[in-house]
Amino acid sequence: MKDKIFIFLQYIIPHSLTSRLVSKLAESKNKHLKNYLINLAIKKFKIDISEAKETDINKYTSFNNFFIRELKDGLRPISSDKKIISSPADGVLSEFGDITNGSLVQAKGKTFTLKALIADSSTTDFTKFATIYLSPKDYHRVHMPIDGKLTKMVYIPGKLFSVNKVTAQNVDDLFAKNERLVCYFKTEIGEVAVIFVGALLVAGIETVWHGKVAPNYYKDIQIWNYDNDSFNIEFKKGDTLGWFNFGSTVIILMPNNNISFKYNQSNANISVNQDLALIAE
């Protein structure tokens, strides 16, 4: 019954208005308010502040600034092996595997289409996927899983349903309904996409090359092309791509059938830069 009420509320809550109000609070630079919110989050979500590069909450300019905190150097080591694809984020590896007949697994018994996710029917090369859920306690920066060059970024407007196990099991096409940002990269294995999926209460999605893109900055699909001589935006595996100002989900799409995942089952905890998959010879 509790889950049904939660799902019902997801459909009647004004997603954009709620997220904008939360964003105003999260961006407040009032010292007393932001310190209260930070301390509340640390206590409620059991955030390990000792992992942060800056452990003094007074040094954070806002609640958002705290949520996109950097980690201590060397805390998430990364493999130098070029055949290892690393995790782009801290969180839970909620689903992963093959893209079968153009569909990805959302949760047990539920699938959604690649076409709906990326709002593009012309791309058919993606054959593997991994979905990582970032809870409020997790580190919120997203990193590059493999060496690559940015070729395109696509903003897709949408809803802002909460993203968690309950909504994944009960809201059809959840990740294809929510607002999202699809970043395409040219890599040695072909085209790879890293997708930032928005959610209720997520105060923003930002990238290091563009700045803030969401929530609901645009009413229509927006496309930025970077695959020309005017741009040369390259990333090494482990470089920071961007961040969420609260928590949500990252989906990585990969093109190569010779990729094998390093996990046997879903819902495993995973850390950024941890080995996610292996590129076979």
Swiss-Prot record:
Pathway where this protein functions: Phospholipid metabolism; phosphatidylethanolamine biosynthesis; phosphatidylethanolamine from CDP-diacylglycerol: step 2/2
E.C. number(s) listed in UniProt: 4.1.1.65
Keyword Cell membrane: yes
Cysteines paired by S-S bonds: none
Transmembrane segments: none
Location of the active site: D90 (charge relay system), H143 (charge relay system), S248 (charge relay system), S248 (schiff-base intermediate with substrate)
Localization: Cell membrane
InterPro entries attached to this UniProt entry: PS_Dcarbxylase, PSD-B, PSD_type1_pro
Superkingdom to which the source organism belongs: Bacteria
Entry GO terms, CC: plasma membrane
Cofactor(s) this protein cannot do without: pyruvate
Record flagged with keyword Cell membrane: yes
Cofactor, free-text remark: Binds 1 pyruvoyl group covalently per subunit.
Membrane topology note: Peripheral membrane protein
The entry's keywords: Cell membrane, Decarboxylase, Lipid biosynthesis, Lipid metabolism, Lyase, Membrane, Phospholipid biosynthesis, Phospholipid metabolism, Pyruvate, Zymogen
Post-translational modification summary for this protein: Is synthesized initially as an inactive proenzyme. Formation of the active enzyme involves a self-maturation process in which the active site pyruvoyl group is generated from an internal serine residue via an autocatalytic post-translational modification. Two non-identical subunits are generated from the proenzyme in this reaction, and the pyruvate is formed at the N-terminus of the alpha chain, which is derived from the carboxyl end of the proenzyme.
Family: Belongs to the phosphatidylserine decarboxylase family. PSD-B subfamily. Prokaryotic type I sub-subfamily.
PANTHER family in UniProt: PHOSPHATIDYLSERINE DECARBOXYLASE, PHOSPHATIDYLSERINE DECARBOXYLASE PROENZYME, MITOCHONDRIAL
Name of protein: Phosphatidylserine decarboxylase proenzyme
Gene transcribed to yield this protein: psd
